[in-house]
Amino acid sequence: GDSVLPNGEVVDTVALNSVTGVDVTTASNVGTYADEIAITGQAGSNGFSAGNYDLSYETGDLVVNQRAVTLTASQQERIYGDAMVLDDTAFTVTDLDGDAVLPNGEVIDTVALNSATGVDVVTTSNVGTYADEIAITGQAGSNGFSAGNYDLSYVTGDLVVNQRAVTLTALQQERIYGNAMVLDDTAFTVTDLDGDSVLPNGEVIDTVALNSVTGIDA
């Protein structure tokens, strides 16, 4: 019942065979392959001779474990006042060996993204960098990709709201020679990013601070 052979003899190694080739078939899915490992021979020392033994071989299981892969959401940007659709291809893949290449030609094509506090669609979100705003919640792949074969880790990304370009143009104003004037602080036009005069979110520029460059107003 013990593991000690007589006369100090030792079985040092055994010849093993993966019955269905799971050991070298890199596309074998994650799971336990029962009785996959078969012993086909042995080598010993200290006087061991196989002919002196009635050797019985019992099979063993081969387990394929998940492969660790990290998906990192890339930083995305939008303009203040505009909603956006998050780009589901804006992510990076880091495989177990440190590169971006998955085994067997498998590919992760897109990821499901979520803006944690809704900055992607809340047009009143102020300009700035919203750290860790973009979260990955899932993925879709091709070329045989199956999420069950991977231990997937998700890393969040930032969402940046950039300033909105708006042009304020001072209108022509007039005065009579000999009279000073007060410049009309409502005499201007607004040109928004999209070409009209309407700012987002119902915002309004009511007045502007005006200056007569050479003092002609006075």
Stretches with model-predicted labels:
Residues G1-A218:
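Solvent-exposed beta-strand/loop surfaces, strongest in extracytoplasmic domains of secreted
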